[in-house]
Amino acid sequence: MCFRTQLPLGRGKGAFRACVDGQMASVFKTYREWKISGDTQWLKQWWPTVKSLLEYAWSEKNPDCWDRDRDGILEGRQHHTLDWELFGPSSWLEGMYLAALEAGAEMAEYLGEQETAVRYRALFCKGYTYMKESLFNGDYFIQQVDLSCKDYIRCYDCPEYWNEEQKQLKYQICQGCEIDQMLAQWHAGLCGLGDIYDKQQRQTALRAMFRNNFKTSMRDFTNAWRVFAILDEQGTVMCDYPNGVQRPVIPIPYVDECMTGFEYAFAGLLIQEGMVQEGLQVLRAIRDRYDGEKRNPFNEIEYGSNYARAMASFALLPIFSGFAYDMVRGHIGFTPIEKGTFRCLWSLGPAWGEFFQEAACSTIVIRDGALPVSTATLGNAGKIVSIWADGENIPFAQEGQTVRFDATTVKTTLRFETAL
């Protein structure tokens, strides 16, 4: 895939090199859209393309050799959304690769390609083990790279990445605490992909990120890049180098900036992992900066006005509602962070509506479309005593937080009454 879509649409393909995080995300976003829609025919149509996107990582046609030796570890020249390249494994891009492998394995398995699924999962396991053992420094996840090694420059013919004065690679994370070091886990939580990073390690890393990257004041913080937070404003910086760890002379681009799209994803991951107050603090810092007096609340600037990445804020809706979905198997679920009365919007391919959580019942209301469903998870409901689909009482079986019933297409309401 080309790094950027050419606009306006119809101009044709760009000629720039492929982007690791964008290409891998296209794989698991396909998985996400399949689960949202339940449209397996659509998946079958695009599956050959999706496979080629994932397998480009080790393809001989890939001049950047992301995973040429097929060991599940990204080691080549890795272009990314921050506009330059990383050399050597990083938890950020490795995580995106692992999420794509996991999504690819599940899609392959469903489509009957068992051998493909086995290959993808074997690569996932190798990469997961490497990341757990070699990319976690005991406090947070890092990039493994030798800044003094000029072999990368020779191998990929990219002299622009070498700082001759300092004899050092440019634009690398190295030992820094980077805001996207577990971005793939945020995506995985939204898509239902499970663990991409070790649970205990990611909890430790999130605490370190909040401690190091979240700044309660910018007065004593030096930022030579673009200034999106000043004076007593709070914000989360892109990459911090705590406790005297080596900071490259020319580190990863935008290293000291506060950009809301990245901050929203970080806040979302904090909340997904149970660190709700920390996540809310990150969110309040953003909204305080864009309060309508200091800055336009409808234009959170990153690389320019109305930059799309700020729409990561919309992920907070499924995160706070604990929204789970799988239209392929007819499943929907809600486990709101708020245990009491709660109300939210939900949206899937076949239908959209509202969810209401109350003391004695939980109700899924369909505002448009029809919802084909046979299982539901209600994380806060307790024991279900009756289920009503479009006003009709239906039989069911409950296993923990999940209820199962005969497949039905709900057109108005699906109501779950609970024992008090």
Regions found by a protein language model. Give the residues of each.
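Long, well-ordered core segments of solenoidal/helical folds
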Residues: 1-6, 46-71, 122-140, 153-168, ...
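Aromatic-rich carbohydrate-recognition surfaces in CAZymes
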Residues: 1-77, 85-108, 121, 128-131, ...
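Solvent-exposed loop and edge beta-strand segments that line ligand/cofactor-binding
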Residues: 10-23, 81-95, 166-184, 194-195, ...
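Alpha-helix C-terminal capping/termination sites
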Residues: 36, 109-110, 191-193, 269-275
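Acidic/polar loop patches that form or flank catalytic/metal-binding clefts of enzymes
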Residues: 116-118, 130-143, 195-204, 216-221, ...
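Extended ligand-binding clefts on enzyme/binding-domain cores
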Residues: 132-256
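Non-catalytic C-terminal accessory modules of carbohydrate-active enzymes
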Residues: 229-232, 252, 257, 263-399, ...
